[in-house]
């Protein structure tokens, strides 16, 4: 079920999680939940992260055999969710047929601190204050872009190396609106899930601010 409420002349998307959704953070683990829990553990998810992000799974229904990661808006309502298979289904991701123009897990973002823009939801759970762009080009009309411009936090960007052109377009638009942007150099052939916490912190500390005078050179590399 999708509902909407008008706020600042904008419709806030609210949806329901699948009826079959079961949480993986309650401490009550049965045979069905052990398999998705093992999958998350192998991917480096601690119990604290599973609890914080309210990660669950579905053992039946449309999302059978899938991990469910909900997104909560700033009021605590579910605005979206991502589902990823933990079995050998050919289709890795299957998400609800609703708009992705949201700030994923806005409820958990501290806009007074630096944010990090990343590609996908699993990347965003790597560290605090990471926001996935969900495949978006982050145009000026998107909710996430407008919120970044409004709050103007120090902004890091760490997209996959194969998304370089899209990354530069996003950086260019943000700089145009006066947002300070630092580029984290993700190693070729890797994404954030392949990088240790120590390595990520090192890359973040050495990230360089992108300015107009260097942007043209970077775009034409």
Regions found by a protein language model. Give the residues of each.
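Short, surface-exposed amphipathic charged segments that create phosphate/polyanion-binding patches used
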Residues: 66-67, 146-152, 191-207
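A generic structural motif
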Residues: 135, 181-190
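TOPRIM metal-binding catalytic domain and adjacent DNA-binding surface shared by DnaG-type primases
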Residues: 1-68, 72-75, 109, 149, ...
């Amino acid at each position: 079920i999708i509902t909407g409420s008008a706020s600042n002349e904008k419709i806030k998307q609210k949806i329901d999680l699948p009826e079959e959704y079961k949480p993986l953070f309650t401490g009550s683990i049965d045979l069905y939940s052990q398999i998705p829990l093992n999958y998350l553990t192998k991917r480096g998810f601690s119990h604290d992260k599973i609890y914080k992000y309210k990660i669950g799974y579905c053992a039946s229904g449309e999302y059978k055999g899938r991990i469910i990661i909900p997104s909560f808006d700033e009021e605590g309502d579910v605005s979206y969710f991502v589902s990823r298979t933990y079995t050998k289904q050919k289709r890795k991701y299957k998400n609800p047929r609703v708009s992705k123009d949201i700030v994923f897990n806005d409820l958990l973002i501290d806009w007074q601190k630096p944010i990090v823009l990343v590609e996908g939801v699993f990347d965003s759970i790597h560290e605090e204050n990471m926001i996935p762009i969900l495949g978006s080009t982050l145009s000026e009309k998107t909710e996430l872009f407008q919120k970044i411009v409004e709050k103007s936090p120090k902004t890091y960007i760490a997209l996959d190396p194969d998304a370089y052109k899209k990354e530069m377009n996003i950086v260019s638009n943000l700089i145009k609106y006066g947002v300070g942007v630092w580029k984290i150099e993700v190693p070729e052939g890797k994404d954030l899930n392949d990088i240790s916490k120590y390595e990520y912190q090192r890359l973040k500390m050495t990230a360089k601010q992108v300015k107009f005078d260097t942007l043209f050179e970077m775009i034409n590399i």
